[in-house]
A protein has these predicted regions:
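S-adenosyl-L-methionine/SAH cofactor-binding core of RNA-modifying enzymes
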Residues: 244-263, 426-442, 446, 453-454
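Active-site-adjacent structural elements in enzyme catalytic cores
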Residues: 1-341
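Short helix-capping segments at alpha-helix termini
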Residues: 56, 390-396, 461-465
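Conserved active-site segments centered on acidic
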Residues: 361-441, 509-512
Length: 512
């Protein structure tokens, strides 16, 4: 696909609007982050958003509108409290969730009966929506799980060749995604913090409940709730400790790894090889604006581990805290805990030694890596089935599994149940985030869908891995995608298990 690069001139916006009208995808600027847009009422166009990003299908999109009248096309019920919020904060960085109109396709809502809507405070975005004559569904315009794009260059790096057009609207003013509040229930619930704070919302609504994650098995009502988000290729670790503890720890780690440190202007000098300031401790807006660019820049500098300080959860700092801690997978290292520090240092040094000493001994057991979206359903079932069959048949091979967007969650209850039916126990499995090291160590990487493969190849462009990453369809030469059973009952999971068993039997018979 050849991607058009467009300006914010009206003549170019008319080209972009025609692309939207014809079912295409256009990246547009907003005041928060750049968005990957499509006609919110066109299910096929919306599907292409998920394909381009490698985004999980149950992760809902936000529909963007250019005027308040458009809200009636999307929302079946708009409570008076929501109208007061719209009067105060629209256009602006606030997304509200409502019960959806029947016309809104489930592809846009992630299968939910609710729709997320906002009116962006960006003239280019609103003009595009106006010219397209339809609400535009748009998540952030990055590969799913990576830091959101806040510049035109970020978009071209991630999405050139994946979308029809990218509009250059300059740098995003705010730099983190919108605040999301659910107005579809009996009481308002804050689902994602942003530039509009809980305190500001409470001035209009009274008490606002805050929920920023979902329970296992639940569908997320808002982007950013379920899957690992905002993550650079480098590991991100939050450090808890005093200045001397942090200095000494960074100095030791810098002898083993290329380390980066996110700091504030008031901080003393650290010995990390790469240091990027998020601005002043007195200015949360500066930290919001700089955070995603800083994470991306650390990757460009070849940093292996990014260390960051603890962040307050007060007012606007809550948004910075949310994004940074999600990027870290909630990993916080307490430097006062000598055992935890020792475990961390031993673990990182062992990884270096393992990488240096590993050989390609042909007599070793072959390693197969199964990959799905969250590593809680399909891939752990595949891992269990493969290892069971290899042991039964005397085949010297071993399987592991990982997810594109995993956060150490337990295996899904239904997956464990249907595997237990055939005598395989996967109940102790915890989801693992896919890493370059996992791919390096595998002889064969089998993924569930073409979208998974595309996401992996795009995310690890620096590695030549297209000779080991396959869908079952590619590897076996027959149409064999494995649909996600997430949200289904045990019958759906049983069907998925049996499909995987059939495919793994064919893989073992073919050899690798």
């Amino acid at each position: 696909m050849t991607t058009k690069f467009l300006t914010a001139k009206d003549s170019d916006l008319k080209i972009a609007a025609d692309i939207i009208k014809s079912g295409g995808n256009v990246i547009l600027p907003t005041e928060t982050v750049y968005g990957l847009g499509a006609d919110a009422f066109n299910p096929n166009a919306v599907k292409n958003i998920f394909k381009a990003k490698g985004r999980p299908a149950d992760n809902p999109l936000i529909a963007h509108i250019s005027n308040i009248d458009m809200l009636d096309e999307l929302a079946a019920d708009v409570p008076q409290a929501a109208k007061r919020l719209a009067d105060k904060f629209w256009p602006g960085p606030l997304t509200m969730i409502f019960k959806k109109c029947e016309r809104v396709p489930y592809e846009t809502t992630g299968g939910l009966e609710t729709i997320a809507v906002r009116m962006p405070d960006n003239k280019t975005a609103r003009r595009l929506i106006e010219l397209a004559q339809t609400p535009i569904a748009a998540p952030s315009a990055n590969l799913s799980g990576k830091p959101s794009p806040t510049t035109f260059r970020h978009c071209t790096e991630d999405m050139n060749g994946r979308v029809d057009a990218i509009i250059d609207g300059g740098d995003c003013r705010i730099g983190v995604e919108s605040t999301v509040i659910d107005m579809s229930g009996e009481k308002p619930v804050l689902l994602r913090p942003g530039d509009v704070t809980a305190e500001q919302l409470s001035e209009i609504l009274g008490n606002v409940e805050v929920v920023t994650s979902v329970k296992d098995g639940e569908k997320p009502k808002s982007p950013g709730l379920k899957y690992k988000h905002y993550s650079p290729d480098a590991d991100v670790v939050i450090l808890s400790g005093n200045v001397d503890e942090v200095k000494n720890f960074i100095a030791r780690q810098s002898k083993v790894h290329k380390c980066g440190m996110l700091v504030f202007d008031e901080f003393p000098k650290f010995d990390a090889q790469e240091i990027i300031s998020l601005g002043s401790l007195k200015n949360p807006q500066s930290a919001m604006h700089r955070l995603f660019t800083a994470l991306r820049e650390m990757d460009e500098r070849g940093v292996e581990i990014i260390f960051a300080p603890e962040i307050s959860e007060k007012e606007r700092w809550r948004a910075v805290h949310n994004r940074l801690y999600r990027a870290a997978g909630e990993k916080v290292l307490n430097l006062s805990d000598s055992a935890a520090v020792s475990d961390f240092e031993i673990g990182t040094e062992k990884n270096v030694l393992d990488a240096d000493s590993e050989t390609k001994d042909e007599s070793r057991a072959k390693k197969v890596l199964f990959v799905c979206t969250g590593n809680t359903c399909r891939s752990p079932m595949a891992e269990g089935l493969f290892n069971y069959e290899c042991k039964k048949r005397g085949i010297e091979a071993v399987a592991e599994s990982a997810g594109l967007f995993a956060d150490e969650s337990a295996v899904s209850r239904n997956s464990a149940a249907v595997m237990r039916e055939i005598g395989i126990d996967i109940s102790n499995h915890r989801s693992r985030q896919l890493t370059p090291e996992m791919i390096d160590k595998a002889d064969l990487v089998l993924v569930m869908t073409a979208s998974h493969k595309m996401t992996i190849l795009s995310a690890f462009l620096s590695k030549k891995i297209d000779d080991k990453v396959f869908t079952f369809s590619d590897y076996l030469g027959t149409p064999s995608e494995v649909p996600d059973p997430f949200g289904g009952d045990e019958t759906v999971y049983r069907t998925c298990r049996d499909k995987l068993a059939e495919l793994i039997d064919k893989v073992l018979n073919k050899g690798f």
